[in-house]
């Protein structure tokens, strides 16, 4: 049986922070983190029970952060792409073949040097932020708020421009990522492995652009700044766009079934 793969970013695509009037789908130490609409949750539940359909989250998050999300617990979603494509987990187990390939690519990058440069940069500029090392693959600077992250972005970019790293600003976080590392690499790897009949993709930010373009059917929320040709754009924005994306996926699956007949 041919599989249909749905690769989707999570934050600001399917799940959203700042919507306490909706259903919380993620807690961190009893604190509410992200939300979905009740209808969006129902759509996702309906999708996850299909035998011909595989939902594969594709996120900048670590595995530990991703595993906090309710619908990703208890084996409901067997495959997860984490760490901006650096890590693939299947049934909670790291894909060693993929991991070795990524580590080979990373070996040419001065991770210890850039880690030192980041620490010096933060200290010398009195930046009030937390430095997070993501499997030694990339680094995250977590500021108190988005304003602080914006204020320091240019300084960080100037200091780190000699390295083969790219910067991604998202809210109060600045991601410092090796230029080779892209979610699309993991997406292509899994598509080759499963040879799906249909690939659906969804994402909202610049780190999603390449993998969204890999889809036969591509969806982006209307609040996204992405500009991709031949893409379905939701009519709604914010958390309602997450619900609409899942509704669109269900419609695409229905049409796929009709076309097969």
Locations of the language-model features?
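Active-site neighborhood of HAD-like aspartate-dependent phosphohydrolases
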Residues: 2-6, 10-57, 66-67
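Short loop/turn segments at strand-loop or loop-helix junctions that form parts
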Residues: 7-20, 83-85, 91, 134, ...
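Short glycine-/acidic-enriched loop or helix-start segments at secondary-structure transitions
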Residues: 17-18, 66-69, 91-92, 210-211, ...
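Glycine-rich, phosphate-binding/catalytic loops in enzymes
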Residues: 22-26, 73-75, 218
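Active-site phosphate-binding/coordination module
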Residues: 36-123
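Conserved acidic, metal-coordinating active-site core of Asp-based
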Residues: 119-214
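Mg2+-dependent phosphoryl-transfer enzymes with acidic/Ser/Thr/Gly-rich catalytic loops
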Residues: 177, 184-261
